[in-house]
């Protein structure tokens, strides 16, 4: 009897483990330099990972230099893998707006260019409506003087070069990280009510 119970427990545990392992969704956002955006989203409880990359353009597998030229149409963006049981898409949208200034067209802080635009790349009608609904609320509350955020259909995401991944963690003393990324992260921490990892 005990052996049967033990086998059932092990079976259930493995089933639960694999169910949890597979129960993730993805979301795509652009809000300026992806070094900053990636680091901020990785703070949020329920986010499994964030990856820097490029989306919203026409060139296949663009390089960083090509994207920076402004000719490919891509935005510096992140791919967020998250557990919907822990954090909803709506909350990620909230974090997106809490972590940058959507009122500046094609600019975040010192970074200027279409690759630094504010954008939400939706994958289905539900995501689209949730993003638009939240923007409507922000406009009604006059949270920002303007909202330039694009809400556009997701097409394809190209991961950025290896050295861009987890850039803030790998280069904490970098001048840009100290002068731009860290202050932006601190402002987000102060503003958000979402649970964050230590």
Which stretches of residues belong to each language-model region?
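Flexible coil/turn and secondary-structure edge motifs
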Residues: 20-198
